[in-house]
């Protein structure tokens, strides 16, 4: 077994950040060979640099690889790396500005769509009731006319529809969505025709007074519902952006590895050595 890994020092972390700013993420061998950083990072391998940079990126954004977390607010720090973190990850501010509820940071990993948006989509498909299904634009227009939604709702609506389709709650036919045939369509109960009863005017006035007295509470409840909807939308949007950033980071790392292998093959061929390439399973991005 090799020697145990030593804990990263603040000097090494700062050198890694400056190296990424100078050469870019994924250029680990280039950073190691740079005379400006090689004396400090001499005890670290390119794998160490890659893993440490990923940890720094996630900690700077306040997000993990699979969950959207609410960053904890702490006292001001005099660390010189705070400005570099803000420079490297400007998109993290968009997440921390969102006032998330206590349970908004729980990403539905089990494929469940939040009840509010799921109910909106099911209502839209039920009301539109197209035999061949409705497209995303038609569903969005219907929901926007009946509900107060966040400005980015149209952007993450396709992911909501895919989750519902994966859980067999709705069906996807080409680019259209519809309710499954097993969905029980609700029909209003038959209304009995009878002579209208004369209502008591005093009871009607009491009802009107009750709603008038409770109007501030209703307004507060509506405002709270709008804020919760906005927070949920921002949480899902932030998670999608984080997953895309992680995917791009993996692609950059794989590209760096391929370039390194190509350079080694070129060096061997230049020396007249015979190099044999063994095919491996293709990795999906």
Curated annotation (Swiss-Prot):
Organism domain of life: Eukaryota
Single GO BP term: nucleosome assembly
DNA-binding feature ranges: 28-56
InterPro entries reported for this sequence: Histone_H1/H5_H15, Homeodomain-like_sf, Myb_dom, SANT/Myb, SMH1-6, WH-like_DNA-bd_sf, WH_DNA-bd_sf
Pfam families: Linker_histone (PF00538), Myb_DNA-binding (PF00249)
Keywords noted in UniProt: Chromosome, Coiled coil, DNA-binding, Nucleus, Telomere, Transcription, Transcription regulation
Gene Ontology annotations for the cellular component aspect, listed alphabetically: chromatin; chromosome, telomeric region; nucleolus; nucleosome; nucleus
GO MF term set: double-stranded telomeric DNA binding; protein homodimerization activity; single-stranded telomeric DNA binding
Sections of the chain in a coiled coil: 226-255
Domain HTH myb-type: 1-60
Intracellular or extracellular location(s): Nucleus; Chromosome; Nucleus, Nucleolus; Chromosome, Telomere
CDD domains: SANT_TRF (cd11660)
Region: Disordered, residue numbers: 1-35
Domain H15 positions: 113-181
Predominant place of localization: nucleus
Annotated family: Belongs to the histone H1/H5 family. SMH subfamily.
Function summary: Binds preferentially double-stranded telomeric repeats, but may also bind to the single telomeric strand.
PANTHER family (alphabetical): SINGLE MYB HISTONE 4, WINGED HELIX-TURN-HELIX TRANSCRIPTION REPRESSOR DNA-BINDING PROTEIN-RELATED
Domain note: HTH myb-type domain confers double-stranded telomeric DNA-binding while the H15 domain is involved in non-specific DNA-protein interaction and multimerization.
Full protein name: Single myb histone 3
Organism: Zea mays
